[in-house]
Amino acid sequence: MISRSIFSKSVSLQRSQNRSFLLTAASAVFGSMIFNENNQLASKMERGELHYDDPNASLNEKKVSPASNKYFSRRESEYPGHVPLYGIEKFMMFIGSGLGSFFHPENNANIVALGESTAIEPVLRKLQRQMLSDPVGRQILREKPRMTSTSLNLDHLRALPKNTLGHTYVSWLDREGVSPDTRVPVRFIDNEELAYIYQRYRECHDFYHAITGLPIIIEGEIAVKVLEFMNMGILMPGLGALLAPLRLKPSQRERLYSIYYPWAFRSGLNAKPLINVYWEKSLEMDVNELRRSLGIEQPPDLRNLRKEYFAKLKKEKRI
């Protein structure tokens, strides 16, 4: 019995020693692993090779929209403010702005969008060739002047002699209550130089009004649009000349068709390319001499014709 008890204690002691050895060995191995890993982490930190995952990475990632894949990638802008459009987008802009321009021609946003959606590349390339083939046109493309009330110095123009282009222009602005600062920048034409050519056309529009004396009432706008279309071939003025009269009164259409359309056809075809006129450098020129040099005849005064028409109506009603 005594020997059995001694043997049992001996076995228990051996087992306890074995467990202690195993625990010690495991602790040593685990500690060595941790120490080795810490050494590796420290080494990586020292070499700049350690990178932790950013928990906010998913929030900082740029959202990828369906339109940004290889089939619908948006082109890069070609100049400040440029908005590249797909063909279908430009077509939808044409439809929307066309309807808006017909029913609400007083909304300038419709006119602007219609103009740029119909400013097709072949027409703009033709104007570009005209400018490149002319020394003044080349100078305009090289210098790229912009027309604002500051660049034109309207106060200086008011002080010029009455027979000058500058005084005629600023007098027309004052009479009609408009400003050269209202011309919005081109956004939807893809080529930078073509965009400038259309911007130039847009900013010169008031000079066409000034040298012809036509007001900004709808009949005057249509007449100037016909002149622009016949001279430069830009589509939007042609569409305006074709469709805008449909909303006019019979008396207005009669004036346009009998007086101002024939004048605009004749002047537009006979005049020199208006896109090549450096208006800013002609401000001190005699306006009548300028008209002759350009080949533009001045049409009958539209406001006077309207006054005469309404006076006649008033007289007939009294009778």
Swiss-Prot record:
Essential cofactor(s): Zn(2+)
Family annotation (InterPro entries): Coq4, Coq4_euk
Disulfide bonds: none
Its membrane topology: Peripheral membrane protein
Keyword field contains Lyase: yes
Keyword annotations from UniProtKB, A to Z: Lyase, Membrane, Metal-binding, Mitochondrion, Mitochondrion inner membrane, Transit peptide, Ubiquinone biosynthesis, Zinc
Subcellular location: Mitochondrion inner membrane
BP-aspect Gene Ontology terms: ubiquinone biosynthetic process
E.C. code: 4.1.1.130
Family annotation (Pfam families): Coq4
UniProt pathway annotation: Cofactor biosynthesis; ubiquinone biosynthesis
Reactions catalysed, as given in the entry: a 4-hydroxy-3-methoxy-5-(all-trans-polyprenyl)benzoate + H(+) = a 2-methoxy-6-(all-trans-polyprenyl)phenol + CO2
Oligomer and partners: Component of a multi-subunit COQ enzyme complex, composed of at least COQ3, COQ4, COQ5, COQ6, COQ7 and COQ9.
Record protein name field: Ubiquinone biosynthesis protein COQ4, mitochondrial
